[in-house]
């Protein structure tokens, strides 16, 4: 009987710990109403240093639906969403792909930062608190992502986002010069297509 009680207590404690971690994470995300930052992104393919890819740029987001991700080095690439359309622009190729906004976090991990409630995160992930400001998210069903790690600074600014995939790829995005709760014009999240750009509009499919 004591073993059964101990087992039930252990299971309850684990479930409470996961729920508490999820609540803590979502509270931190909820506190980010708008944000801008510079980023340094490193992609490691299969653990081989020779295959590492680094990029830098800047980003901004504004709840409930606006997102802007500008890569400046080594190439000019832009990902911009106004909540209904998503533009993916490659300056070197002079090409823009227009998509409908997806809810697929595997494809667009930034969607976690726009989450408004625990239901979506709890439905998709098991959340574990690694330390006071670091959270590990393990997908319940997604086959593409192995895990997502999110770390906040002591003042609850986003410090880094790390993604491990089933393709043995690891991406770490470190943020600096973070500003939160700032006023950002909605027009910043509409993409103006440059002249002589090849347009692939997938919203009409």
Swiss-Prot record:
Stretch forming the signal peptide: 1-21
Location(s) in or outside the cell: Periplasm
Main location: periplasm
Domain of life: Bacteria
BP GO annotations: lipoprotein localization to outer membrane; lipoprotein transport
Keyword Magnesium in annotation: no
Keywords: Chaperone, Periplasm, Protein transport, Signal, Transport
Subunit structure: Monomer.
Purpose: Participates in the translocation of lipoproteins from the inner membrane to the outer membrane. Only forms a complex with a lipoprotein if the residue after the N-terminal Cys is not an aspartate (The Asp acts as a targeting signal to indicate that the lipoprotein should stay in the inner membrane).
Family the entry assigns: Belongs to the LolA family.
Protein name: Outer-membrane lipoprotein carrier protein
């Amino acid at each position: 009987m004591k073993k059964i009680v101990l087992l039930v207590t252990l299971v309850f404690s684990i479930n409470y710990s996961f729920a508490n971690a999820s609540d803590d994470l979502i509270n931190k995300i909820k506190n980010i109403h708008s944000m801008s930052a510079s980023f340094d992104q490193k992609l490691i393919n299969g653990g081989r240093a020779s295959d590492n890819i680094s990029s830098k740029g800047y980003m901004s987001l504004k709840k409930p639906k606006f997102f802007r991700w500008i890569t400046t080095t080594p190439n000019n690439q832009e990902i911009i969403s106004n909540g209904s359309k998503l533009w993916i622009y490659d300056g070197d190729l002079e090409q823009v792909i227009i998509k409908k906004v997806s809810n697929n976090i595997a494809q667009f991990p930034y969607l976690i930062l726009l989450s408004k409630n625990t239901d979506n995160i709890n439905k998709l992930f098991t959340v574990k608190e690694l330390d006071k400001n670091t959270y590990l998210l393990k997908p319940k069903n997604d086959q593409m992502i192995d895990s997502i790690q999110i770390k906040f600074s002591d003042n609850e600014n986003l410090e880094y986002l790390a993604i491990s995939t089933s393709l043995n790829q690891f991406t770490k995005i470190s943020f600096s010069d973070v500003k939160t709760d700032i006023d950002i014009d909605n027009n910043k999240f509409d993409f103006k297509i440059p002249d002589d750009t090849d347009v692939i509009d997938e919203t009409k499919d």
